[in-house]
UniProtKB/Swiss-Prot annotation:
InterPro entries: FeS_biogenesis, FeS_cluster_insertion, FeS_cluster_insertion_CS, FeS_cluster_insertion_RrpA, HesB-like_dom_sf. This is Iron-sulfur cluster insertion protein ErpA. The gene is erpA. Homodimer. Required for insertion of 4Fe-4S clusters for at least IspG.
Length: 118
């Protein structure tokens, strides 16, 4: 007799419904179901690190993949260490619309919110 053990693993980074729905809409506009949103961290910006977003058609072998609403968020291993516990989100307000990261690991952010320090 064999038994299965199911273990719930916490997601290393969260992909909000609003971000996933925006990506879903952009995929529909481009008519390219292979598109995935990639979030990454680079050195730079006024606080030391900057977030970046781009679209990719393929995932790298070592990417972390998070799915929501039928779309995929990709994070490379180097960036993931800075984003653990964070949330990729999307806002559309008076200041414009944009993807952003709510990062609990950031000790400081710049005024525009696109760079951070740890």
């Amino acid at each position: 007799m064999t038994s299965e053990v199911q273990v719930e693993v916490a997601m290393p980074i969260y992909f909000s419904d609003s971000a996933a729905n925006k990506v879903k809409g952009l995929i529909a506009e481009e008519e390219n179901p292979n598109m995935k949103l990639r979030v990454y961290v680079t050195g730079g910006g006024c606080s030391g690190f900057s977030y970046g977003f781009t679209f990719a058609e393929t995932a790298n072998e070592d990417d972390t993949k998070i799915e929501n609403a039928g779309v995929t968020l990709l994070v490379d291993p180097m960036s993931l260490q800075y984003l653990v516990g964070g949330t990729v989100d999307y806002t559309n307000g008076l200041e414009g619309s944009r993807f952003f990261v709510n990062n609990p690991n950031a000790t400081a952010t710049c005024g525009c919110g696109s760079s951070f320090s740890m």
